[in-house]
């Protein structure tokens, strides 16, 4: 993994608490990825309702990956898992026997070239963790899943404030574009496709 990028992306417990408070004030559900057991314990103290497992944790190559997965599993809370770097889905399912799991199709490139998406593979997953630019990929994924008859379609998209300089800013969409994407997805969800 690119440790410099990862370190720049890390948030402190203090920042997590601030973000949780802002989310609570705006009726937005807060959850995030935990990369070590102490982070899970801290997120539990914030009373998060679900967890996100990043692709690199699924590979079990980070120093505390296995312990972190087991800590999240003990919470029995819903868990979103990005499979962008691979990982053994069957093994991960064994770790989480009592959690509602959402496995997301993902390619861990920032930004991701639209042409690299394998739609046939993507629709085999419960959700889509998207790193492409723009709104096309999430809209296509939602349409394909809706056509399959899926009712609960999960989309993960990195967003930023205008002029943000964060490490994933080049592959993130601003809040105006995000709002347009949500409106398009809601139209698809309320359409009859089959």
Language-model region placement:
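Catalytic cores and adjacent flexible loops of soluble metabolic enzymes
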Residues: 1-194
